[in-house]
Amino acid sequence: MEGMRRPTPTVYVGRVPIGGAHPIAVQSMTNTPTRDVEATTAQVLELHRAGSEIVRLTVNDEEAAKAVPEIKRRLLAEGAEVPLVGDFHFNGHLLLRKYPKMAEALDKFRINPGTLGRGRHKDEHFAEMIRIAMDLGKPVRIGANWGSLDPALLTELMDRNARRPEPKSAHEVVLEALVESAVRAYEAALEMGLGEDKLVLSAKVSKARDLVWVYRELARRTQAPLHLGLTEAGMGVKGIVASAAALAPLLLEGIGDTIRVSLTPAPGEPRTKEVEVAQEILQALGLRAFAPEVTSCPGCGRTTSTFFQELAEEVSRRLKERLPEWRARYPGVEELKVAVMGCVVNGPGESKHAHIGISLPGAGEEPKAPVYADGKLLTILKGEGIAEEFLRLVEDYVKTRFAPKA
C-alpha cells in the first residue's frame, strides 16, 4: 500500500512529518474555548493520548492568542510534545502580528483563503501571515472550505461558466471554485518564497463523492501534501460511514498524507471518538497499524450460541487492556491479528489467516474448539474454560512472536 503513495515533499509539523513516504498522520481538533487554558490543555492531552499526532485549536480572539503559549508550556510539562496548529479566520494577520509568542508556540498555521477579507485587503492579509510563517520557519496549511468561498472568485467562475457552450451545473462550479481557491493561494505562497516543504493543502466539502473529485484535482494540479477530511461528517454511524466512504477511495489511490475525521460528538461522548475512527479507517485499509485486530463473524443460523460473541468481546477488551504494556515490551504487537469464529464453515480458514484464531463449535457441531497459530493447528480446547484458556494462549503467543530479538 505504501508504495502507491503520491510523491510529495515532506513537511514537518513539530516533529511529525507529513507527506513523502511517511505514515499518514492522524489529526484532531479541540472544541474547548482556547482562552480556557485548563480545559484546552486537558483536551489536547486527552486527544494526544488517544493517538492524535497533531492537534488543532482555534485562535479566534486576543484571549485565545494569549492562552496559546501557556497551553504549550503545560503540555511540555506533562511530557506531551504534541504539535499545535492554530486555526485562523478573519483576524489571523492581526493576532499573529500582535502576539509573537503565540505565533512561536504554534507548530503550524491554518489559513483559509476564503476568510481573509475582500479585494486587496485579502491579498495583504494573506501576505502578512505568510511572511510571519516564513520569518519563524513555520509550515502553513492552506485550507479552503466550500462553506466560506471568496464570493469574488465564485462570481468570476460562474460568469466564465455562463459563457461556455455547455455550462456546468452551479454545484460543479462551486467545486471548481473550491479547488481554484486552494491552488491560487498555494501558488501565491510559493511565489512569496514559502518553501514546498512548508506547505500543506486542503479543500473540504461535506459530501463523500464531492471530496473525492476535489482531491483528485488537487493531486493533479499540485505537489503539496494533502490533508483529507470532510468538513462536517455528522454524528454517530452516519458520520463514521461518510468519513470512511470519502477517505477510502483517495487513500487507496495514494492520495492523502494526513487525515482528520470531523465527527459531531453526541452529548457526553468523548472527543477522542474522532481519533479512534481515523485510526480504524487507516488500519482497515492496511495503511497503518495502531492496535491488535480481532476478526469475528457476524453469526447466522449455525451459531445458535452467543458464546462466540461474548468471547470476541472479551478478547477485544483484553487486548485493549494489555496494549499499553505490550507496546512497551513487544515491538510490532500492533500488527497482531486474532480471529474468533462461530462455526466450522469459515472458522478454521479465517483462524489460519490470523496470527492466532479459534473456531468455536456451531449448532450441531462437536463441542470442541480448534486453535490455530501461524496457520497451523496449535491445540483443541474443550469444556467450560475455553475463554480463559484461549486468552492465555493469546498472551503466550504475543510473548513468543513479538519478543525483542536478542
Curated annotation (Swiss-Prot):
Keywords: 4Fe-4S, Iron, Iron-sulfur, Isoprene biosynthesis, Metal-binding, Oxidoreductase. [4Fe-4S] cluster binds at C297, C300, C343, E350. Its EC number is 1.17.7.3. One of its GO terms (biological process) is terpenoid biosynthetic process. Binds 1 [4Fe-4S] cluster. InterPro entries: Dihydropteroate_synth-like_sf, IspG_bac, IspG_bac-typ, NO2/SO3_Rdtase_4Fe4S_sf. Belongs to the IspG family. This is 4-hydroxy-3-methylbut-2-en-1-yl diphosphate synthase (flavodoxin).
